Amino acid sequence: MGVGKEVSFKESFFLSHGNPAMLADESFIARNFLLGWKKNVFPVKPKSILVVSAHWETDVPCVSAGQYPNVIYDFTEVPASMFQMKYPAPGCPKLAKRVQELLIAGGFKSAKLDEERGFDHSSWVPLSMMCPEADIPVCQLSVQPGLDATHHFNVGRALAPLKGEGVLFIGSGGAVHPSDDTPHWFDGVAPWAAEFDQWLEDALLEGRYEDVNNYQTKAPEGWKLAHPIPEHFLPLHVAMGAGGEKSKAELIYRTWDHGTLGYASYKFTSI
């Protein structure tokens, strides 16, 4: 049983959520993309939102199932005002149960509900700018960094029917997300970052999803700097899988911080 048939979507999205400080610091130009979400990217109000979070790591897929989740202040080095901010969107236990049902039906041995999990900054920070009214129910889905990209693609494939039930599907991570100790690049974009980012764009727009799933052997060597650990890349694979059996990828935004942190974001539309 679905979660509703009032609206139906063909799109799933991957967003590079970037530095959480952008919520309070207007110097971040990526704010403009998120603030313009409803006007420029997705004007239809969904029934609910499912966010695949780079900041929730588990051994098996877990989905937040609480009715009134709190926000999690899982960051440092941000304006002090952010620790007073809230995002009072309700949870959606019905959607959480539907996610669990679809994953089990899709062949996953385990999919857990977590009634205590709050909204981490993968969701509440971008949603505060995208949907500031906080009147749309939200669930979060975890990633499994111990499992490969194909696993995450298959998670998305199993959850693709949600789009037809009025659920806005968002993978929230980072297209290029190096370690914190990676030196900044002050002359444009670091060559390794630009090369990986361009490879990713080309592979997605050309429909070479298998190459993206196998990025550790298909991508330029710079992938080791772009994603030294995979948790920020895996939400892209879930969103890519949620595009459905056939989908077309589109780059919808790109900018950089410090020449190394890439904000490329994509839309996957079923055709």
Curated annotation (Swiss-Prot):
One of its GO terms (molecular function) is stizolobate synthase activity. The keyword Metal-binding applies. It catalyses: L-dopa + O2 = 4-(L-alanin-3-yl)-2-hydroxy-cis,cis-muconate 6-semialdehyde + H(+). It is an enzyme of class 1 (oxidoreductase). Its cofactor is Zn(2+); Fe(2+). The keyword Transmembrane does not apply. Keywords: Cytoplasm, Dioxygenase, Iron, Metal-binding, Oxidoreductase, Zinc. It is found in: Cytoplasm. Expressed only in colored petals and pigmented tissues, absent from green stems and leaves. Its EC number is 1.13.11.29. InterPro entries: Extradiol_dOase_DODA, Xdiol_dOase_suB. CDD domains: 45_DOPA_Dioxygenase. GO terms for cellular component: cytoplasm. Zn(2+) binds at H17, H55, H177, H232. Its main location: cytoplasm. Binds 1 zinc ion per subunit. Pathway: Pigment biosynthesis; betalain biosynthesis. In contrary to the fungal dioxygenase (AC P87064), this enzyme does not have a significant 2,3-ring-cleaving activity. Opens the cyclic ring of dihydroxy-phenylalanine (DOPA) between carbons 4 and 5, thus producing an unstable seco-DOPA that rearranges nonenzymatically to betalamic acid. Belongs to the DODA-type extradiol aromatic ring-opening dioxygenase family. This is 4,5-DOPA dioxygenase extradiol. The lineage of its organism: Eukaryota, Viridiplantae, Streptophyta, Embryophyta, Tracheophyta.
